Regions:
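N-terminal lobe of the biotin/lipoate ligase/transferase fold
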Residues: 2-154, 220
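Conserved RNA-binding domains used in RNP assembly and mRNA/RNA metabolism
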Residues: 17, 259-306
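General small-molecule cofactor/ligand-binding pocket signal
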Residues: 81-83, 162, 296
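Conserved beta-strand residues within beta-sheet cores
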Residues: 99, 105, 166, 176-178, ...
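A generic structural motif
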Residues: 105-107, 170, 182, 262-266, ...
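Short, acidic Gly/Pro/Ser/Thr-rich loop/turn segments
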Residues: 109, 200-203, 283
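Nucleotide and nucleotide-moiety/phosphate-recognizing core
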Residues: 120-222
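Conserved, helical-rich catalytic subdomain that frames metal- and/or nucleotide-binding sites
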Residues: 215-271, 276, 305-306
Length: 306
């Protein structure tokens, strides 16, 4: 794994967030003393944090609004872990029991499908859920999760969210949410890991990405999102019952449907065709003109529009 180093300013921002997560109010002078920086420099760093977090400064007192501070939420029925800095929330979750949540402000080694780098800017929401499911139910997660995420964004924020196969959530052609699904067998059940990255109040570095802040023109308290996701994941088996209905809604939201694409196959070249459908378990159906192929997200490294 390539070593990733933090710049000094990001380190101090994370230290400040750690202090604010543990206290209702922190004085600028106290932060300067604890971090060993001049007060003026601390004030500048806090001012920068205000661009990505719901942080207020009044009379030299710094507060992080509880609705945006992940340390202030305790989802019922979950083992909840908040750590400002981690290698990967997925890796932390692997050492925890099922029905655990891991939230972080920054991941040094966040990753998506096939190990691709997952950029975790400050101000976003980087979260992993670990729970236990029967395999026959778990197979419908790749279709259910994008639908659940799209519906949430549409209903709560009025965002025209759509799905880019297999499970990216896009707005105006730019990525707003990414999802990774992993699992491991334990006896007759699966331990499922759902990693979700939401560009909330961060400023994405990639032009093909977008944040809620950029779309709405305002900051969004992240704990509302954590609370909703926690509630849904706690009842996930109920959501997966009507997988036929989920598949139909997935296809309605699928921006990839009907497009001509190039599918980069792991170790086997490129397949060009038109996306004609998706199965109940999330496999894509490509019409090459001579045949229809069913391909899974584990087989396709990347899907490019033509």
């Amino acid at each position: 794994m390539e070593q990733k180093l933090l710049d000094s300013k990001t380190i101090f921002k994370l230290k400040i967030l750690e202090e604010l997560s543990e206290h209702d109010v922190v004085e600028l002078d106290d932060l300067a003393g604890k971090l060993g920086l001049p007060g003026a420099e601390i004030a500048l760093i806090v001012d920068e944090l205000k661009n990505n977090y719901l942080i207020r400064v009044e009379n030299s007192n710094v507060t992080w609004l509880p609705g945006d501070n992940p340390a202030r939420i305790k989802p019922w029925g979950w083992n909840y872990v908040y750590r400002p800095l981690v290698g990967s929330t997925m890796h932390v979750a692997r050492r925890l029991s099922p029905w655990s949540i891991v939230v972080s402000e920054y991941q040094l080694h966040g990753y998506g499908r096939h190990g691709k780098e997952w950029i975790s800017d400050l101000g976003g929401l980087w979260i992993t859920f670990k729970f236990s499911l029967e395999e026959r139910i778990a197979q419908y997660l790749p279709v259910a999760l994008p639908v659940i995420l799209c519906e949430f964004l549409r209903e709560k924020y009025g965002v025209d969210a759509k799905i880019k196969w297999p499970n990216d959530i896009i707005v105006g052609g730019r990525k707003l949410v990414g999802v990774i699904i992993e699992g491991e067998y334990f006896r007759n059940r699966l331990h499922v890991y759902i990693g979700i990255g939401v560009n909330v109040n961060n400023d994405p570095k990639l032009e093909r990405a977008v944040s809620l802040k950029q779309i709405l023109g305002r900051m969004t308290p992240r704990n509302r999102i954590i609370a909703y996701f926690s509630g849904v994941m706690g009842r996930i088996e109920k959501y997966l019952e009507d997988h036929g209905k989920l598949q139909a809604r997935y296809l309605e939201l699928l921006e990839t449907l009907g497009r001509r694409v190039a599918a980069l196959i792991l170790g086997d070249g490129v397949i060009i065709g038109k996306v004609s459908g998706v199965t109940e378990t999330g496999d894509i159906i490509l019409d090459t003109g001579t045949e229809k192929l069913k391909l899974s997200s584990t087989e396709i490294y990347e899907l490019r529009y033509l």
